[in-house]
Amino acid sequence: MNFDTIIIGGGMAGLSCALRCLEAGLKTAVIASGQSALHFSSGSIDVLAKTPSGEPVSNPMTCIDTFAKEYPNHPYATLGKETVERAIDWYRNTLSTIGVPLTSQNNGLNHYRLTPLGAMKSTWLSQPFVHQFPMDLEKNKTQKMVLITIDGFRDFQPKLAQDNLKQITQLSDLEITTANISLSAFNDIQRNHCELRSIDLSRLLSKRANRQELAYALQQHAQPGDLVVIPSIFGNGTGLTYLKEIEQLTKLTLCEVPTMPPSLLGIRLEESMKHAFIELGGTMLNGDHVVQGEFSYVDKSDPEHSHYRLNRIFTKNHGDFPLQAKQFVLATGSFFSQGLKANVDSMIEPIFGLDIAQSDKRTDWYSHDFFSTQSHPFLSMGIKTTANFQAIKSGHVIDNLYCAGAILSGYNPILEGSGSGVAISSGFHAAESIIEQLQPNDFFQNNNIKAEVAL
């Protein structure tokens, strides 16, 4: 099979890149080995919560503008403020078009979202039913918060969240109560209702009668004007519609919080992007992974100094049948997604054997204090790339292989709260670089073209 672009990885970076390529009319394929880290995510878009030195950030874009001078190795420094802003605006508009509106504060500042443990976490964009608390919590206008869960549901504990919220001094005037709700639908299922996860509950609540029962139960514990916090138990597609329906029935203000995995807020993003990709005519190769690639020298007369070119790749499911493309993007993630692996004394990129920006001493990979405020150095290690995010192998630049997302070096998404922002921005940048080179003459006019899907 031949494509204009093949993206290896089906997470935030890979799907962002794929959607932008399709918009420009490129014949695009995504190879996704399985569930991405979005199944474990909050569903909000973190652009920058802290600087690499650990200083809290209130205005991400203003702060990113200083990175070229203060943190020159950071992906944001390479991308620049203008590209990051363009990428995030594009992503917000794209997600709104495909049914998942994302909003931010009008003043350009981060906002706080509530975590399932009752902490406040800084983020940039959130989904419609994620309540946005101001960065200055003393300006919070909510007077009463009601934390409600489904009886027996293990992945959100209101009492624990309540105890932690009461530790936040700026919220000392906030009245916080908790409640458990039982559904009669539990009587009709074969399993113990304590075994149900968020996806199971979303299936039960797809029935209107069960939603009406839930709405009535919520009204017994809250009044209009209260902020009613519930676990994210409404899935993709109709999930947001169901939440609007319950708000209209109850006149309550609902706030979703992500649960322990699987997180339906994160899954909502992934499934919406994948569905849009297929609807636009993309080819999704699910449940497959790349095992190797074939390279050639760009300048065969001087191989020692020549750049490389990736000609084709081989996957586990397609065996000896290669996939070819003019351009490739590697967005396989970091250690969590097995985009990077580590052995006793070194780190490797397992598909192409790309060069890694890492310390030679294993003792430099980690902090001696496990809960160090500066996190662990290995989280900032990743692929060596050019300033245009082209991969490097054995010191040779690979002209047509770009890297995006968590596989990049020079930043710590956990410490900084920058994972989604870097993923979207670097994926968008890779797509823009590819589009500029290929400049297709023919654009897809029919958005209803169905994709070829290899299972």
Swiss-Prot record:
Signal peptide: none annotated. Pfam families: FAD_binding_2. It catalyses: a quinone + sn-glycerol 3-phosphate = dihydroxyacetone phosphate + a quinol. One of its GO terms (cellular component) is glycerol-3-phosphate dehydrogenase (FAD) complex. SUPFAM superfamilies: FAD/NAD(P)-binding domain. It is an enzyme of class 1 (oxidoreductase). Keywords: Flavoprotein, FMN, Oxidoreductase. GO terms for biological process: glycerol catabolic process. Belongs to the anaerobic G-3-P dehydrogenase subunit B family. This is Anaerobic glycerol-3-phosphate dehydrogenase subunit B. It comes from Aliivibrio fischeri (strain MJ11). The lineage of its organism: Bacteria, Pseudomonadati, Pseudomonadota, Gammaproteobacteria, Vibrionales. The gene is glpB.
